[in-house]
Amino acid sequence: MAFTVLSDENVKQLFQGFGPEDVAFASDVLTAAFLSYSVGQEAQYQPHRAAVVRPNGQTGLFMPATTEDGMSVKIVGLPPPSSGSTDLRCVLTVCDGTGKAVGIINAEELTAFRTSLGSILLYRYRKRTENIVVFGAGKQALWHLRLALVLRGSDIANITIVNRSQERAFKLMERLRAMDRASGVGGTDMVSFTVIEATPDSAPGNDLLRSVVEKSDVIFCTTPSTQRLFPAEWLTSERASAKSRYISAIGSYKLNMKEIDPDFLRAVIDTPLGTFSSAHGGKKDGIIFVDSREACFLEAGELVDAKIPAEKITEIGEFTDSLRKADEAEAELLRDWLENGLIVYKSVGIGIMDLSLGKVILELAAKHNIGTKLPDF
């Protein structure tokens, strides 16, 4: 394969036409990566990412990864808090198993896609997904909603976007509709969109926001917040706990950050809130799903603040392996839990996600003759 350079527009072009079959294929690739990390031998060969914070608050993240047949390094630039921007800049270099570089990818869109796909791996099982609430209006919010619409568009009736800026939320809605038109998949014309302008400071007194959170079937948290996005009580009250939901939180990546109230996480593992009893018999205690237990203990502020013990945390690769190996009765219970139980997923991202999906994107680019080729690199 010739060395390939993919710009941001190239990557968007490749993703634009993704339909259910493409998402299913990418899901299988990411699932295999999680399995190799959690129950294979790959975890020991993954250097942990490094973060450097400059005096002005500019942050650089360096995320290496290796597998038997590849290596990669992603560099992420995060603006200082004083800039007022949450947009990140990132680039992924992909090598083969010998270390020969095979491609370089503008990874802004890819990062949002791979993180969102991690959330969707568990979401796709859900029986009820009528009411979705997403916190944030950036690329992560876009791809969480886009993937949900591609896979479950006919089952989604209401999407509420919660953001400090209405303008950005409306731009998100427009891009979702444009992607729908370009691919013919998504069903945005059948969905009712609502925008709520709110911040973590203003949320506690916002009755409308509380109402949509309590009625939600799915909550996607996609913001780099240093405060809880809403109080735990909104999910632990008698009215809110009468229904189950799927919740993912992917925005916080430092110990001083948190999206989900730590009190809610404690309630999931310490109270009947997280307990699932199947109508067919069988019971599961509340746990927190993660991409990497080690990475989350180092970087997930809400998990650390909640003091969630290791035995109450399950990696998605571990769970997938358990489901794959379970006997018929246990497998039925696990699937019922995923479909109807309270499922909470926390991700900080790991390099093997970038490497596995980066290789897929390079292969798709070669197939469709997209990008710039450098045969003599």
What are these regions (language model features)?
Residues 119, 128-152, 156-168:
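Glycine-rich adenosine-cofactor-binding loop
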Residues 153-199:
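NAD(P)-binding Rossmann-fold cofactor-contacting core
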Residues 356-377:
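Phosphate-binding loop/pocket of nucleotide- and phosphate-handling active sites
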Residues 223-225, 251-252:
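Short glycine-/small-residue-rich Rossmann-like dinucleotide-binding loops
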Residues 1-122, 355, 376:
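N-terminal ligand-binding/catalytic initiation module
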Residues 234-235, 240-337, 361:
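Rossmann-fold NAD(P)-binding glycine/threonine-rich loop
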